Amino acid sequence: MEQYLSLFIRSIFLENMALFYFLGMCTFLAVSKKVKTAMGLGVAVIVVLTISVPVNQLVYANILAPGALGWAGFPDTDLSFLSFLTFIGVIAALVQILEMTLDKFFPALYNALGIFLPLITVNCAIFGGVAFAVQRDYTFTESIFYGAGSGAGWALAITLLAAVREKLKYADMPEGVRGLGSVFMIAGLMALGFQSFSGVSI
C-alpha cells in the first residue's frame, strides 16, 4: 500500500501534469478565471484520468502489446501501432459519458464548462497520463493511483491559479502585464514553487 500512496503523492506534487510536464495548458489557462468553474473542470479531469488510465492500460496489456494476444491464439501479433488511436477512442467515449451525465444531473456546471468539456478528449494531460502509465509499465492498481494522482495534481494546479486570478481582479497591475501576461508569470512562479518538491524523497 505504501508504494501506491507514494505514487499517488508523487504524481500530484513531484510530477504535476500542469506545472512539471506543462500538459493541458490550453484549458489550464482558459478555464482558470473562476475558482468554481476551475474546480468543476478539475473534478471532471480527475474522473476521466482515474478511469481512462487503468482502462487503457488493460487494453494495451491484453490486446495491443506485442504478444498480448497469446490468449486468443495469436502470440506473434503486435498491435502496438494502434495504441494512440485506441487510447484517444477510449478517452473520447469516457468524456462523452461524462458530458451526458453532467448535462443530465449538473446543468449549471455543464453550461459553465461549455466547449472545454468536450475538449478534455484532446487534452494532452489526459493523453499524457495514459501514455506515461503504459510507457512505465504500471500494473492495473498502480494505474488507478497514478491516474487519480495525476488528475488531482492538475485539478489542484488549476484551482490555485484560478484563486490567484480572482484576487488579481482587484489589484492595480501595470497595463503591460494585465490579462494573459500576468497569468503566464503566475503559472511560471507556481511551477517554480512545485519544483521545490523535487528534492523530497518519497
From Swiss-Prot:
EC class: translocase
Localization of this protein: Cell inner membrane
One MF annotation (Gene Ontology) recorded for this entry: oxidoreductase activity, acting on NAD(P)H, quinone or similar compound as acceptor
Stretches that traverse the bilayer: 11-31, 39-59, 79-99, 114-134, 144-164, 180-200
Keywords associated with the record: Cell inner membrane, Cell membrane, Ion transport, Membrane, NAD, Sodium, Sodium transport, Translocase, Transmembrane, Transmembrane helix, Transport, Ubiquinone
Signal peptide segment: none
A GO BP annotation: sodium ion transport
Subunit structure: Composed of six subunits; NqrA, NqrB, NqrC, NqrD, NqrE and NqrF.
Matches recorded under NCBIfam families: nqrE
Identification of the protein by name: Na(+)-translocating NADH-quinone reductase subunit E
Gene for this chain: nqrE
